[in-house]
Amino acid sequence: MKASKKVTVQDIKKATEDWSIEITPVAATKIENFADYLPLNTTVNVTCLPGSDPIETIQTAEQLNNDGMNAVPHLAARSLVDQLELDNLLKELVSRASVNEVLIIGGGGKKQIGEFSDSISVLRTGLLQKHGITKVGVAGHPEGSTDISDERLKTALLEKNELAKTEGLNMYIETQFCFDSEIVLNW
């Protein structure tokens, strides 16, 4: 039997580098100061759930910024009315919360309420770059999606990757919780 290596504090610190946490705007109202619970500069994703108000996202991002965190708001394409709303939302996120990174999602099975049908349609507007946002997360689905075929998911990721290269966006893929490492590694 192979001897296991003793885990050191340094090993634990290394394993927890560059991690992020996620919060809803409603849950954020229960936290007086995020710095009481998280190390400074922790990346905190701010969800965009069905029926949520963009003002709540802005306020949560602002609180996170004031508490020394890196707020990464989720922008759900199918929940946005039009480019004007997106432009105003980005303007507020940047000016009030110093946001420089966002996660663009389609919005799951949400009914499209405006001009954006998917995340790439948001990426194509050029509004992220206009507001100085060049680090952009997009959704990855290693275990598939009930809303989109596997082939369309693959094609969409390739399109987003090509757009990111063309537009100079620093794009990364963020996934939901995955419990089968083999699926993720094969993906």
In which residue ranges do the predicted regions lie?
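Hydrophobic, aromatic-enriched interface-forming segments
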Residues: 147-166, 170-187
